[in-house]
UniProtKB/Swiss-Prot annotation:
Entry EC number(s): 2.7.1.2
Gene: glk
UniProt name for this protein: Glucokinase
Molecular function in Gene Ontology: ATP binding; D-glucose binding; glucokinase activity
A Pfam family per the record: Glucokinase
Length: 323
């Protein structure tokens, strides 16, 4: 068995590659490449291996799209490939290609304590189910269960479940967005574009015309307290994040914890801490007491996708992760 394996975390814009120490899971020599500068993912990998003069026989690549078979076609990029053909072309003995949130979920058992921030609840119960979700360009969701001392990630497209309002204000948001979009999924409000949808719906429901704002503009105005509509949108975003996380916790009784990943929330961490997130997480009527002890964590590790891809591969190779 080789000392190092190749791991990757590939999104619509960038491809992050690194080496993973197989024995320890340590991530080394990480580098980010622009996906726009290469014709294929295989070309990026060859470039990385050439630059680092690395010989590897095992690899795990996490990609932001559903993985349903040998043929992988990225949702937000032109790259498409056969897993078997790529494995052969790269001379690998073993190539795993997994969903990006499968990778993030697999990082949970190996996350250092200093790489998470807790938002309420008590201590996680070892070996109990875990939920992980995150808002970025879209809304990613996964669950994690421990079976016979092995962690199994339950991948899915949970971000596309129905948006379920639970207040008059949220009812108004749904009415506006339904008129525009037809089906309104959770991702339509819990993502970068979703924050824009919330802002627009708030303004339209008041019979006014919204400005053309980007997510960063809405966040900046909310934090500066210079726009009431933007502040309402960001506050509502935090509340709906809580409601959605509570739903995930109920699905599998996730006493192992609920983890938040993704690029949006860390940009307004102090606002998030003071928001209605935790109250909304527990706002489940007769099951409020059930949720009070379930801890919620924000992942602050800079590269959870790479860490999780390494953990996924190491477990496949026979290593036992923390329970």
């Amino acid at each position: 068995m080789t000392t190092y394996a190749l791991v990757g975390d590939v999104g619509g814009t960038n491809a992050r590659l690194a080496l993973c120490a197989v024995a320890t899971g340590e991530i080394l020599q990480a580098k980010t490449y622009s996906g726009l500068e290469y014709e294929s993912l295989e070309d990026v990998i060859k470039q990385y291996l050439s630059e680092h003069q690395a010989k590897v026989t095992d690899a795990c690549i996490a990609i932001a799209c559903p993985i349903t078979g040998d043929w992988v076609a990225m949702t937000n990029h032109t790259w498409a490939f056969s897993i078997a053909a790529m494995q052969q072309n790269l001379g690998l003995d073993h190539l795993e290609v997994i969903n990006d949130f499968t990778a993030v979920s697999m990082a949970i058992p190996v996350l250092p304590a200093q790489d998470v921030l807790q938002f309420g609840g008590t201590q996680p119960q070892p070996g109990k189910p875990v939920a992980v979700y995150g808002a970025g360009t879209g809304l990613g969701v996964a669950h994690l269960v421990n079976v016979d001392r092995r962690w199994i990630s339950l991948a899915g497209e949970g971000g596309h479940v129905d948006f379920a309002p639970n207040s008059e204000e949220e009812d108004q948001i749904l009415a506006v967005l339904r008129q525009e979009l037809g089906h309104v999924s959770a991702e339509r409000v819990l993502s970068g574009p979703g924050l824009v949808n919330l802002y627009r719906a708030i303004v339209i429901s008041d019979a006014r015309l919204p400005e053309k704002l980007a997510p960063k503009d809405i966040t900046a105005r909310a934090l500066a307290d210079s726009c009431t509509d933007c502040r309402r949108a960001l506050s509502l975003f935090c509340v709906i994040m809580g409601r959605f996380g509570g739903n995930l916790a109920l699905n599998l009784s996730t006493f192992g914890g609920v983890y938040i990943a993704g690029g949006i929330v860390p940009r307004f961490m102090e606002f998030f801490k003071a928001s209605g997130f935790r109250a909304a997480f527990e706002d489940k009527g007769r099951f409020k007491d059930f949720l009070q002890d379930i801890p919620v964590y924000m992942i602050t590790h800079p590269q959870p996708g790479l860490l999780g891809a390494g953990a996924y591969l190491r477990q496949k190779l026979g290593y036992e992760l923390s329970s």
